[in-house]
């Protein structure tokens, strides 16, 4: 009974995800609009194709098809069409991924660089996929590293950056992101991720830190590098147990 209930709930969710995406006949693609993006400076009603959400849609719909096959059902052809035609991440003339397809001033307007750099979550929290060019994502990471308004970030932004750097083969940045000396990257003796006097407990930071460390140690499916999130400079003796690779 439990398995049937879980399967039913997942089916409802996956059908919603398919129905939520809009087919753009002119562009022969599916787009995401009207969602509340992780980057909170974006307007939900007007935002088109935020990158983290696009990548998550691609990943989640693939998992939905795998679950159908495990349940003995055929793949949903409409879902496969969505997976095949989902919009790639939008970028500018400098090869930098935008905060959203219609956020053309991402790297000029300080509002866009004073919040979660959610674009990094598209590869890091999630695996690399066909919507993303690795060279453009590396460009984006470097620009964010050098220019972001880090004083306006939140606790989970640092582990998200570390996971992105790990998957892009930048272990030095992964470690430095977790150790960055910023107020919102502070952990108190009791373990809480301090943000400010108003917000002394911030669990997304704790969860992000644990997830980032696990990825940096155990890697991900198909990763052949030992401890991929730590520099190979002879200064690290990494020991861990009981962790599984991420997707």
Q: How would you describe each model-predicted region?
A:
Residues 227-247:
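Surface beta-strand/loop "capping" patches
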Residues 1-14:
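Single conserved hydrophobic/aromatic residue that forms the stacking wall/gate
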Residues 22-24, 29, 111-114, 201, ...:
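A general structural signal for short secondary-structure junctions and capping/turn motifs
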Residues 2, 24, 153, 221-228:
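Short, surface-exposed helix-loop/turn micro-motifs enriched in polar/charged residues
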Residues 8, 51-222:
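Active-site core of glycosidic bond-cleaving carbohydrate-active enzymes
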């Amino acid at each position: 009974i439990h398995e049937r209930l879980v399967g039913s709930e997942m089916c409802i969710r996956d059908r919603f995800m398919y129905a939520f995406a809009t087919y753009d006949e002119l562009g022969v693609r599916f787009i995401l609009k009207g969602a509340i993006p992780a980057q909170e400076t974006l307007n939900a009603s007007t935002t088109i194709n935020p990158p983290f959400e696009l990548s998550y849609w691609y990943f989640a719909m693939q998992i939905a098809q795998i679950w159908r096959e495990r349940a003995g059902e055929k793949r949903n052809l409409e879902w496969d069409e969505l997976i095949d035609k989902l919009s790639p991440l939008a970028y500018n003339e400098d090869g930098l991924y935008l905060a959203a397809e219609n956020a053309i001033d991402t790297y000029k307007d300080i509002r866009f660089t004073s919040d979660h750099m959610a674009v990094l979550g598209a590869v890091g929290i999630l695996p690399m996929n066909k919507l993303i060019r690795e060279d453009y994502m590396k460009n984006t990471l470097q620009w964010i590293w050098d220019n972001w308004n880090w004083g306006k970030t939140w606790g989970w932004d640092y582990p998200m950056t570390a996971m992105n750097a790990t998957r892009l083969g930048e272990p030095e940045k992964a470690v430095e992101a977790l150790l960055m000396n910023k107020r919102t990257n502070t952990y108190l003796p009791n373990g809480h991720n301090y943000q400010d006097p108003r917000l002394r407990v911030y669990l997304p930071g704790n969860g992000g830190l644990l997830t980032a460390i696990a990825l940096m140690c155990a890697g991900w499916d198909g990763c052949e590098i030992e401890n991929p999130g730590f520099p190979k400079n002879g200064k690290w003796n990494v020991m861990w147990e009981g962790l599984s690779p991420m997707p």
